[in-house]
From Swiss-Prot:
Main location: Golgi
Pfam family, one: Galactosyl_T
EC number: 2.4.1.86
Protein name per its UniProtKB record: Beta-1,3-galactosyltransferase 2
Signal sequence segment: none
Pathway where it operates: Protein modification; protein glycosylation
Function text: Beta-1,3-galactosyltransferase that transfers galactose from UDP-galactose to substrates with a terminal beta-N-acetylglucosamine (beta-GlcNAc) residue. Can also utilize substrates with a terminal galactose residue, albeit with lower efficiency. Involved in the biosynthesis of the carbohydrate moieties of glycolipids and glycoproteins. Inactive towards substrates with terminal alpha-N-acetylglucosamine (alpha-GlcNAc) or alpha-N-acetylgalactosamine (alpha-GalNAc) residues.
Gene responsible for this protein: B3GALT2
The keyword Hydrolase is annotated on this UniProt entry: no
Lumenal topology ranges: 46-422
Glycosylated residues in this chain: N75, N100, N119, N176, N226
Cofactor: Mn(2+)
Listed GO biological process terms: lipid metabolic process; protein O-linked glycosylation
Places the protein is found: Golgi apparatus membrane
Length: 422
């Protein structure tokens, strides 16, 4: 026992060489810590670090410095110096242009008075307490898209720059502009600039645009926190270049959209177009997420109210064409929030326009609905599809759409018999 205690509890007498080695080790450790601390102080004062300009303080104003467009409305502007660096750019004060038919007063709009006044005070503290300006330039544009034809429906599809396969799959399926006989559809993909600063990818996008003429792109960074800018880009494009469009759908690149059902059962081309019409999957009574670790986090100083106004899931909503200009203009007086669907709902509340429920609560789905030709022939949206899945299920639906439920029942009975035999 005594021997064990000496071995494990008591220090043996150290030689001079051992002491010197131990001192050298400790000295190296201390110097390493000092060096790391000095490096931290050095990098912490340089604005060019990617981590330095995070999205939390001003999540929607990140763009590229050094961009020079020779002609902002042409399809393929010069991209020289576009990949040099990213910097935050403060929104410039600008008086919002009010429509004569639009009441921009927040009075009487439930849950907005305190929010808008709080936004104003925060803006003044940070130097951005003014109506938003919208100054993002076009890199790719399609200004003549509605001059060549008079579409009944525009599909605004939010896509990431690198989602080339998703765009290809959508063109082959629900985004096919010749899908509905006698009904003109226009497809537009909404893009920002890749955060990876990939010159090869940008050249591929330019070539894709030359081939299909269905991409618009502006000079903001394409990130989750800039989805609101992406949607406003689409709204402004519709208001500017397709002001007389009857209907618009905004959706995402990972969605399954039954375009034929949308047109024939919801929009009904034989009827006069509606006005101030907005529908989708209604989100009613939702409270702001105050968990700072959540990507849906909403700081109380940006939105102090306890409930959001009614809004529609951003995975897919449909609105009358006249609302594009109204939503864009009213947005110039409301601070941009990174939750795009919530923000559009706030704009509608300020316009005193209530989203209306669809005829069937199951037609808009912000989750993935298990596939059957019967179910998918009676819905408008389903979420989270890979490009290969989209093509597979779309082709199956087209083959069975005239007797979708009968064929689905036969397939189910066949699978049941197969399992029983085996």
């Amino acid at each position: 026992m005594l021997q064990w205690r000496r071995r494990h509890c008591c220090f043996a007498k150290m030689t001079w060489n051992a002491k010197r080695s131990l001192f050298r080790t400790h000295l190296i450790g201390v110097l390493s810590l000092v060096f790391l601390f000095a490096m931290f102080l050095f990098f912490n004062h340089h604005d060019w670090l990617p981590g330095r300009a995070g999205f939390k303080e001003n999540p929607v104003t990140y763009t590229f410095r050094g961009f020079r467009s020779t002609k902002s409305e042409t399809n393929h502007s010069s991209l020289r110096n576009i990949w040099k660096e990213t910097v935050p750019q403060t929104l410039r004060p600008q008086t919002a242009t009010n429509s004569n038919n639009t009441d921009l007063s927040p009075q009487g709009v439930t849950g907005l008075e305190n929010t808008l006044s709080a936004n104003g005070s925060i803006y003044n503290e940070k130097g951005t307490g003014y109506p938003n300006s919208y100054h993002f330039k076009y890199i790719i544009n399609e200004p003549e898209k509605c001059q060549e034809k008079s579409p009944f429906l525009i599909l605004l599809i939010a896509a990431e720059p690198g989602q080339i396969e998703a765009r290809r799959a959508i063109r082959q399926t629900w985004g096919n502009e010749s899908l509905a006989p006698g009904i003109q559809i226009t497809r537009i993909f909404l893009l920002g600039l890749s955060i990876k600063l990939n010159g090869y990818l940008q050249r591929a996008i330019l070539e894709e645009s030359r081939q299909y003429h269905d991409i618009i792109q502006q000079e903001y960074l394409d990130t989750y926190y800039n989805l609101t800018i992406k949607t406003l880009m689409g709204m402004n494009w519709v208001a500017t270049y397709c002001p007389h469009i009857p209907y618009v759908m905004k959706t995402d690149s990972d969605m399954f959209v039954n375009t034929e059902y949308l047109i024939n059962k919801l929009l009904k081309p034989d009827l006069p177009p509606r006005h101030n019409y907005f529908t989708g999957y209604l989100m009613r009574g939702y409270a702001p997420n105050r968990n700072k670790d959540s990507k849906w986090y909403m700081p109380p100083d940006l939105y102090p109210s306890e409930r959001y106004p009614v809004f529609c899931s951003g995975t897919g909503y449909v609105f009358s064409g006249d609302l594009a200009e109204k939503i864009f203009k009213v947005s110039l007086g409301i601070r941009r929030l990174h939750l795009e669907d919530v923000y559009v709902g706030i704009c509608l509340a300020k316009l005193r326009i209530d989203p209306v429920p669809p005829p069937n609560e199951f037609v808009f789905n912000h989750w993935r609905v298990s596939y059957s030709s019967c179910k998918y022939s009676h819905l408008i949206t389903s979420h989270q599809f890979q490009p290969s899945e989209l093509i597979k299920y779309w082709n199956h639906l087209q083959q069975n759409k005239h007797n979708a439920c009968a064929n689905a029942a036969k397939e189910k009975a066949g699978r049941y018999r197969h399992r029983k035999l085996h």
